[in-house]
Amino acid sequence: MARIAGINIANHKHVVVALMDVYGIGKTRSKLICLRTNISESIKILDLTKDQLELLRCEVLKFVVEGDLRREVTLSIKRLQDLNCYRGSRHRKKLPVRGQRTKTNARTRKGPRKLMKK
């Protein structure tokens, strides 16, 4: 198992798919990393040399990923809540933030229905 950005990555996966296991790296960024490091997207992690793995690690560290990105997201949400702005209040009430309807739908965000007592 290779270790990139503090995440264990399975050896049997292709490089592009394996990089997507890191929080903050999606398909586009994964392909960009492969392009910058001149590593073929079809190679599996198992077949990479130590130098290629080190190149991947260095390239991934140029982006904000994993714990730092999670911290940024939570701090930006907390900032909105502290400002008492509309978006912050929607986050606090656990309702949709971007103007979606809530009379029906929004069950994922609101959670399961609460039973009413008779």
Swiss-Prot record:
GO terms for molecular function: rRNA binding; structural constituent of ribosome; tRNA binding. Keywords: Ribonucleoprotein, Ribosomal protein, RNA-binding, rRNA-binding, tRNA-binding. It comes from the Bacteria. Residues 93-118 are annotated as: Disordered. InterPro entries: Rbsml_uS13_C, Ribosomal_uS13, Ribosomal_uS13-like_H2TH, Ribosomal_uS13_bac-type, Ribosomal_uS13_CS. One of its GO terms (biological process) is translation. Belongs to the universal ribosomal protein uS13 family. NCBIfam families: uS13_bact. Part of the 30S ribosomal subunit. Forms a loose heterodimer with protein S19. Forms two bridges to the 50S subunit in the 70S ribosome. Located at the top of the head of the 30S subunit, it contacts several helices of the 16S rRNA. In the 70S ribosome it contacts the 23S rRNA (bridge B1a) and protein L5 of the 50S subunit (bridge B1b), connecting the 2 subunits; these bridges are implicated in subunit movement. Contacts the tRNAs in the A and P-sites. This is Small ribosomal subunit protein uS13.
